[in-house]
């Protein structure tokens, strides 16, 4: 007795697909294209649907030819062959290499010559031009040539000449910044009805208090370097490994964004010895790190 072969469910599905796709398609009539009197065309096509039935599709279309007058130089440039990385790209602008901007048409006014002449003869306008000729945009935070609102350090540094909580250098242990609350308490002692803590009252011996570690716990600004133009992907350990080649590093502070966790572009490196800091400043200023050139200088003491 012959044994019957049992097919798997996947084999049965493949068998059904093959029987469906092998429907007879050789007996279909060729497509027809008929021109009508009103200028339209009637296109008749035949095909086999999913049920294996012969279907006739009739379409009526109208061909419209639009002519556009362009600059012959522009038309010639469109026929140029692409080269380099875009040699195999199709015709037209590629989105990864070309940015298509808005075509702005310049339309001068009718009295533009008279307006230009009046503007040239205006003494106030000329005085304003002479006044602003040598002036440049200067940031109030980092003294860079950009607007203060666009400064990359506006969230972490205070404007020059102002004391603020965002000043990174002031937050690393400077004595002038710590003396602020004591001065405020002394000034507020003269106001009637205002409360002044006992430690800040006039004549209090421990007005400012002592820091943990005494004088050895304070930061030496003379041995602190300010590193700018730091990559967003930089890490504190990488900076420590680079700067520890010149001496013992006591602290590394890399400013990072609170939301993204990426570096903001600057860092502070503190050395135990100023001679090591001078050596590191001379060697690392202009050093290439993560495709960027580092700018290393001594940190300025907070005012």
From Swiss-Prot:
Which species is this record about? Chaetomium globosum (strain ATCC 6205 / CBS 148.51 / DSM 1962 / NBRC 6347 / NRRL 1970)
CDD domains the UniProt entry points to: eIF3G (cd12933), RRM_eIF3G_like (cd12408)
One Gene Ontology cellular component annotation held by this UniProt entry: eukaryotic 48S preinitiation complex
Q: Per its UniProt record, what HAMAP family does this chain match?
A: eIF3g (MF_03006)
Disulfide cysteine pairs (residue numbers):
none
Question: What protein family does this chain belong to?
Answer: Belongs to the eIF-3 subunit G family.
- Residues annotated as region Disordered? 1-38
The primary gene name is TIF35
- Residues forming the RRM domain are 223-301
Q: What is its main location?
A: cytoplasm
Q: What is the protein's name according to its record? A: Eukaryotic translation initiation factor 3 subunit G
Keyword Protein biosynthesis listed? The answer is yes
Under the subunit heading, UniProt states: Component of the eukaryotic translation initiation factor 3 (eIF-3) complex.
Functional summary from the UniProt entry: RNA-binding component of the eukaryotic translation initiation factor 3 (eIF-3) complex, which is involved in protein synthesis of a specialized repertoire of mRNAs and, together with other initiation factors, stimulates binding of mRNA and methionyl-tRNAi to the 40S ribosome. The eIF-3 complex specifically targets and initiates translation of a subset of mRNAs involved in cell proliferation. This subunit can bind 18S rRNA.
Q: This protein's superkingdom? A: Eukaryota
Which Pfam families does the record cross-reference, listed alphabetically? eIF3g, RRM_1
Give the InterPro entries listed for this entry: eIF3_g (IPR017334), eIF3g_N (IPR024675), eIF3G_RRM (IPR034240), Nucleotide-bd_a/b_plait_sf (IPR012677), RBD_domain_sf (IPR035979), RRM_dom (IPR000504)
| One GO process term, biological-process aspect | formation of cytoplasmic translation initiation complex
- What keywords is this UniProt entry annotated with? Cytoplasm, Initiation factor, Protein biosynthesis, RNA-binding
Q: Is Protein biosynthesis given among the entry's keywords? A: yes
Subcellular localization is given as: Cytoplasm
For this UniProt entry, the molecular function terms from Gene Ontology, in alphabetical order, are: RNA binding; translation initiation factor activity
Tell me which PROSITE patterns the record gives: RRM
């Amino acid at each position: 007795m012959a044994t019957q072969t049992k097919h798997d469910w996947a084999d049965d599905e493949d068998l059904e697909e093959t029987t469906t796709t092998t429907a007879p398609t050789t007996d279909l009539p060729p497509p027809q294209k008929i021109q009508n009197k009103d200028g339209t065309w009637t296109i008749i096509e035949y095909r086999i649907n999913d049920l294996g039935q012969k279907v006739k599709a009739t379409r009526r279309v109208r061909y419209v030819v639009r002519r556009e007058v362009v600059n012959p130089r522009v038309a010639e440039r469109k026929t140029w062959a692409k080269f380099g990385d875009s040699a195999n790209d199709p015709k037209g602008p590629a989105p990864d290499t070309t940015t298509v901007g808005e075509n702005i048409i310049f339309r001068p006014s009718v009295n533009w010559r008279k307006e230009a002449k009046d503007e040239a003869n205006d003494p106030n306008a000329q005085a304003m031009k002479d006044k602003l000729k040598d002036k440049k945009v200067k940031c109030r935070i980092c003294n860079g040539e950009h607007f203060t609102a666009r400064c990359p350090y506006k969230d972490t540094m205070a404007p020059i000449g102002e004391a603020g909580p965002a000043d990174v250098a002031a937050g690393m242990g400077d004595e002038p910044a710590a003396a602020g609350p004591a001065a405020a308490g002394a000034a507020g002692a003269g106001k009637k009805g205002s409360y002044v803590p006992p430690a800040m009252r006039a004549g209090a011996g421990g007005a400012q208090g002592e820091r943990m570690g005494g004088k050895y716990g304070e930061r030496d600004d003379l041995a602190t370097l300010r590193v700018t133009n730091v990559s967003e992907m930089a890490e504190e350990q990488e900076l420590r490994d680079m700067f520890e080649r010149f001496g013992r590093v006591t602290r590394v502070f890399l400013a990072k964004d609170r939301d993204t966790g990426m570096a903001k572009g600057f860092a502070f490196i503190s050395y135990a010895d100023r001679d090591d800091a001078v050596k590191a400043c001379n060697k690392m200023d202009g050093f290439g790190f993560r495709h960027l050139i580092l700018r290393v200088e001594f940190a300025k003491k907070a005012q």
